[in-house]
Amino acid sequence: GNDLLGHLGFLKNNIELTAIEILEQAVVLLAPIKDRYRTIVKNLSQQNPNLLLCTVYEGNLVGDSFYSDIAFASKAMVSMFNDIVFNTASTFKTDVLELRNIFISPEDYANPIEPSHLGGKKYSQEILRWVNDK
């Protein structure tokens, strides 16, 4: 998630590109993140087969003065990265916690990017549920 935050400028880019060019640039941008992520999961899965991967949540960007213009485009980028998460989980036989189903209301966020104590409580409850099921 934080790696994606570092690339928000990509979404704010005012250069006119075709849809194909935008998608190609997004894939290129995500490639090193994907490689690092898969390497980390591979190494961890060799040490402990019980891993829980988490998707990236979308944030509460709509209506925020800094992020509002990229709120919907950021969902597409998050979805592209979450595809990497699900693909990696499938490859290494790990579970996935879908954070987009946890952080669903404005109250779940302390600010546009970070979870609030309410969101954090929901998150921790889901992790505990996963641990107790193992």
Predicted regions and their residues:
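Alpha-helical cap/lid subdomain in secreted, periplasmic
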Residues: 1-117, 121-132
